[in-house]
Amino acid sequence: NSEDLDFISSVSKETLSFDLLDVIQSGPDDRLNQTSFTQPALLATSYLYYKKFLSITELTPNIMAGHSLGEYSALVASGSIDFKTALNLVYKRGLFMEKSDAGSMFAILNLNIETIYSICDEVRDTLDEIVAPANINSANQVVIAGSHKAAALASEKCKVAGANATGILKFG
């Protein structure tokens, strides 16, 4: 609803010194794709979905859980931290990611973890650059991360081995 959108807009202006809602709606895309903007945008979207859920159901969740960035959404939904605090934290999280060494992340789908580790080891030894599984999201989805070159090569080798691989993020 418009009250929730106004809330996102005003809190982001106050906390981050820019209107997050405007960035989400108007871009430009290259700005929205920077992790310092992407992370707050995802938090805001999750928050809005949660508020919508509460408005259309009579359910009151007893337990909240989140994974990675979703942990912040869960903390807000549970009342453990307020939206303003979470927004500031995820913005800083995105800034730190942008300042880290340059690299890429790829989601590797439908390939067993042993094969992924083996491919990452092989690429690391061949190129003498870092690439490794960074996040095991499920039995069917593992995120690998490393230098642009090593992560891209490992992703391609995973595809040859039968995986579906999707580039998800460049950082640094």
Model feature map: region roles:
Residues 7, 41, 68-69, 81, ...:
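An amphipathic alpha-helix/helix-turn recognition signal
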Residues 1-65, 111, 144:
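Helix-rich "cap/lid" substructures immediately adjacent to catalytic or cofactor-binding pockets
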Residues 46, 62-70, 74, 82:
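Gly/Ala-rich beta-loop-alpha elbow adjacent to hydrolase catalytic centers
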Residues 13-18, 27, 51, 78-172:
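Alpha/beta catalytic cores of group-transfer enzymes, especially the acyltransferase/condensing modules
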